[in-house]
Amino acid sequence: TPHVQGIMVEYPMVQARQCVVVSDAMPLDQAACVEPLAIALHAVARAGNLLGKRVFVSGAGPVGCLIAAVARLNGAASVAISDMEAFPLSVAVRLGADAAFKAADPALADLANGCEACFEASGSVGGMNTCLRSAAPGGTIVHVGFLGEEEVAYPINTMVIRKEVT
């Protein structure tokens, strides 16, 4: 099934084979969360044990907010999240994030080298770089966001030699 970018619209156009019939017994607001929650659960599982760990999430869309919630439910000591918009950050806080930062907030620098698990859910190169800066040495970065067809250069020396991130 091809990836569809930008599905957060009132009336998305998708192919019939991408649709699933939902029981009338399931409320639509819950049904709408199934797919992003599945992604969040998978991402958090990829990060390993989060008990007592500091977590950072770049991107407070549906997937990023649900990653924050699942990380909190999996015992993360703290969960910080960033986004370009204020409203999704407020949702993330309601779902369990301890700290929410606008992407341009200089306070994001305080996370540098301090998060044992980072999740890139914004689909942006800037978000990827913020995760890399925020990751503690030996930490884990789980890349969830879709960057489209753009070629991205990962700073391998920083990731492997200086930080030893996985």
Model-derived regions, located:
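Glycine-rich phosphate/adenylate-binding loop and adjacent beta-alpha elements
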Residues: T1-C19
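Short, glycine/polar-rich helix-capping loops at beta-to-alpha or helix-loop-helix junctions
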Residues: I7-M8, M84-V91, E150-I156
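Glycine/charged-rich beta-loop-alpha catalytic/anionic-binding loops adjacent to active sites
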Residues: Q18-L28, N113, E164
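Mid-domain Rossmann-like dinucleotide-binding core that forms the NAD(H)/NADP(H) cofactor-binding site
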Residues: M26-D105
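Redox-cofactor binding/interface segments in oxidoreductases and associated redox assembly factors
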Residues: K102, E120, H143
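A short acidic, Gly/Pro-enriched loop at the edge of an enzyme's catalytic core
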Residues: A109-C118
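Glycine-rich phosphate-binding loop and adjacent beta-alpha segment
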Residues: V125-T166
